[in-house]
Amino acid sequence: MRELVDDFIEMNQAGLVLELCEKLYDEDVVMLNNGTIFAESMREAYDKQKRFIGSIKEFDVKLVSEVIDGNVSELIFHYKMTGADSILFDFTGKHVQTWKNGKIVREEYFSVEKI
């Protein structure tokens, strides 16, 4: 599992969000964003992410912390992204991921205070 989580971290930091979606999310993944369902399949998540990622011209992501416990990983990243319209998105987010058979089957994303 360590290698899978490392893959997620590296791809996320490189801005390869769509590629990591296809590689690491289960087809039937359930994704939540601050307690609200964001997507109920990899394809739905991919399509929603694609719209956002397409509007980003600069992508700077730093890993703040990581914990792996059994089949659950908790990753906190600080994101700084600049949109094509020069608007800066500056936020910190926690990803709590449940893994099964080498894929993320559930991910809960939480906005957290700036660290």
Task: Give residue ranges: language-model regions.
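Short, surface-exposed coil-to-beta transition loops
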Residues: 60-61, 76, 89-95, 108
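Short, cysteine-centered beta-strand-loop-beta hairpins and adjacent loop/turn segments enriched
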Residues: 55, 80-90
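Short beta-strand edge/turn micro-motifs at domain boundaries
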Residues: 92-115
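Short acidic-aromatic low-complexity motifs
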Residues: 1-27
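Residue-level signal for well-ordered, solvent-exposed loop/turn and beta-edge residues enriched
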Residues: 30, 87, 103-105
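A solvent-exposed, acidic/Ser-Thr-rich amphipathic alpha-helical stretch
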Residues: 18, 22-69
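A short hydrophobic beta-strand element
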Residues: 69-79
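Short beta-strand segments enriched in hydrophobic/aromatic residues
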Residues: 25, 79-81, 95, 111
